[in-house]
Amino acid sequence: MNFCKLEIFIPETHLKILQETLAEHDAGHIGKYDSCISYYHVKGTWRPLEGANPYKGEKDTLSVEDELKVEVTCRVENLDTIIEAVKKIHPYEEPVINAIPLIRTGL
């Protein structure tokens, strides 16, 4: 089986719905455990450009906000479905979701 790690940046207000969505799509399933995620408080910056519809912030103004970086392991074959599900519940117009291949895991 091939696995990857997802990094998802999201406002803390949306953590619960993200956890539920990930669990519904079997992300974070490790052995005899499910809902295994890690999250960290981080600062995010962005500047909305012409035509953007930001969750927070104003056009041409650099924003700095607290957010969470969520990490979760998933099977590669479920990756596209998981990313689409996360995008549906994510408040950002352009969510940052990184998929990182894992060479070796404790699975």
Predicted features and spans:
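Hydrophobic structural segments
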Residues: 1-107
